[in-house]
Amino acid sequence: MKNSKIFINTKNGSYPILIDSELINNLEKILKLYSIKSSKYLIIFDKNVPKKYIRIIKKKIKKKIILLKFLSSEKNKNQKNVDYILNILLKNNFNRNDCVISVGGGIIGDLSAFAASIFKRGLKFVNIPTTLLAQVDSSIGGKTGINTKFGKNLIGSFYQPSLVISDINFLKSLPPREIICGYGEILKHSIIANKKFFSFLSKNIMKIIKLKKPYIQKSIYESCLIKKKIVEKDEKEKNIRKLLNFGHTFAHSYEATLGYSKKLNHGEAVILGIKSACEFSFKNKILNKVDYKLIQDHIIRINKSLNLNKFFSKKDVNRIVKFTTVDKKNISEKINLILLKKIGKPTYKNFYKVSYLKKFIKNQFNNN
């Protein structure tokens, strides 16, 4: 593929997503091309990003720069760190024409974007996602948020960036586990929206995971395109955007039960969540057997050892169920699950009693 570019158009802002290699080496030109003209920049970056990339970014931005480093951890995505960022912006007299640049994965992006969104009611924000997961998920759509002891992303805002720069070269520095995590979101997008794309993934899974450029670039592009179409129709998640949460009710409850530990990261939780949502759909005669088996086989090819028994036991069932009840999609006393009719056709108005969901989760431990 040539340089891939997608424009996101919403009521609250339009912005481009650039997908290619060597983008960071052309950062100065890109910022100028897309009218990112600021006198000061706060660059918030993940400490795991290779130092050479931070040096390149510093060299390309010939303005006043403040660097702020965080460890990428769900536990660090909190109000305390938001306050820390806001205090730095205030102490250095940032105004609304200045810019925050996030360089890292989804956690750093969420934290940075939320701080930018509430500082003087909105500061310019540029997202440079460095993980596959962030490039295909959190960098698109304007969701920002932080965690609380009550659950994940319960405090946040919708705030669109001015620009997203997805440089594929960053992915070369990631461990295989992180690539698999990002692939889980790509798989989710194909399952809810495009069977042809799902078939492409099934055919080329190893080439994608090994970051072969035409395949990984196409996968990122197609995945972003799916999310773009959904976000443009429903920016604030009133209706169709809820489909992007396929597997996430389960995923978030699995993460929360483990206290957002590194034992299970977000991408792995999403894959487990997809697996659970498909099994729930199949057991309730919503999803047909052929597509159910295609998805389950695909997940096994990704990581055959990824199952609930690896992380939980039956004694964790009550805690898992408890965290599903704080999901933002729920109404009254019922759990709203995003389920699947067939590959490419999800459904988002499926309400079940907590007791019914508890029985299902308990039975999963017998089947994994």
Residue spans for each PLM region:
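Solvent-exposed alpha-helices and their adjacent loops that cap or buttress functional pockets
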Residues: 93-95, 118-119, 147-148, 155-158, ...
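C-terminal charged capping/lid subdomain of soluble metabolic enzymes
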Residues: 14, 184, 286-368
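Short glycine/serine/threonine-rich phosphate/pyrophosphate-binding segments
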Residues: 107-114, 135, 253
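Glycine-rich beta-strand-to-loop/alpha-helix junction loops that act as flexible
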Residues: 73, 103-105, 246-247
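ATP/NTP phosphate-donor binding region
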Residues: 2-99
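Active-site segments that bind and position negatively charged phosphate/pyrophosphate groups
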Residues: 204-317
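A glycine/threonine-rich phosphate-anchoring loop and its flanking beta-alpha core
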Residues: 9, 18, 114-206
